[in-house]
Amino acid sequence: MGKEKPHINLVVIGHVVAGKSTTTGHLIYACGGIDKRTIERFEEGGQRIGKGSFKYAWVLAKMKAERERGITIDISLWKFETRKDFFTIIDAPGHRDFIKNMITGTSQADVAILVIASGAGEFEAGYSKNGQTREHALLANTLGVKQMIVCCNKMDDKSVNYSEARYKEIKNEMTSFLTKVGYAKVEERIPFIPISGFNGDNMIEHSANMPWYKGPTLLEALDNVHPPKRPVDKPLRLPLQDVYKIGGIGTVPVGRVETGVLKPGMTVTFAPVNVSTEVKSVEMHHESIPQALPGDNVGFNVNNVSVEDIHRGNVCGDAKNDPPCKTESDAQVIVMNHPSGIRPGYCPVVDCHTAHIACKFEKIMSEMDKRTGKVLRENPDIVKNGKSMMAQLVPSKPMCVETFSDYPPLGRFAVRDMRQTVAVGIIKSTVRAK
């Protein structure tokens, strides 16, 4: 039966100390993703190092540490199931490259849980100009995560004491902010749930501590999420993650189908190298499959192409149906974290799908209002943090990207410099590069 449930990708966002790990750990545990014995083992370890109060966060931290040390962990720990759906937590902001991952993402998130600390001064810190609450909410909307659930966490904090007035204050602030960022009909579409990620209030069952709250629990809100429509009817786009040479078989490119369908017998084109060939076979989890659909990570065997011809960052498409090609693009870019600001001529690295290529801001056409897209200045000489621009990007070597409106996963990117994400953007239009 289980196979019939829709799969939904979930991302958990919010300021550093909002309690994301505790909330996520508790949720996975409550939905049966982690057995009690594991929690108890972690809890003992936590108490030994004086962290007993972090038992659910400790679960995620331990999993993360084990992942970082290369110990394989049961990936089911990052999955849980509700009455209606299977959920996979695709990333949590504790990761160093969280913003880059969220953009170039191994997966597009279908829904975001925004965790907010309700404690006195804590909400204000996360919501301040330098806090991550704003940045993450803006990012989620820019990257097309249209469904959101807001958790007002730490309602059990002494400074809050399950206060309805504090909940309303935070809800009002955040409703107007999310509307500014670009979320529509926030009041109707985004649930605000007062919770305690540690004690479990309003996570699975309604809390006796907050009889004034009549809305859904976190679990009920997750069950109300609409499963995404996977784009099978679009032309094929498959960015390559790796290309292997396998003895006795030949060249095997590997990647995730983003749109369309990949089948044996198809003629495919790789961009920007403009190499075409026939697909001999398609495999997933070491088994031959008749077709690969969006979301599938696959390896496929191709005729007469060597590992020197195609590389990570190339894009595979259907030679007969809108094949991909090398492109230059105009993009809307939001500057997030640049020490001085971005000027024409700036040449950072752009991470778009699996491609990682230096691109020059050839021309900055305008500075715009982030939310409305209204032009504020034509041809600015510099665009600073928090501002949005329309820019012409020219890659230093051939690159294949697509417009965000046609192929979202190939149309959103991170701008990286000084080992951090300095800006994010979406491709508005492309032209075939000469």
From Swiss-Prot:
Positions of region (G4): 153-156
Region G5: start-end pairs: 196-198
Annotated region described as G1, given as residue ranges: 14-21
Which family is it part of?
Answer: Belongs to the TRAFAC class translation factor GTPase superfamily. Classic translation factor GTPase family. EF-Tu/EF-1A subfamily.
Give compartment(s): Cytoplasm
Q: What does this protein do?
A: This protein promotes the GTP-dependent binding of aminoacyl-tRNA to the A-site of ribosomes during protein biosynthesis.
- Protein's name according to its UniProt entry: Elongation factor 1-alpha
Region annotation (G3) ranges: 91-94
Highest taxon of source:
Eukaryota
PANTHER family (alphabetical): TRANSLATION FACTOR
Q: Which organism is it from?
A: Blastocystis hominis
Q: Where in the numbering of this chain does the tr-type G domain appear?
A: 5-232
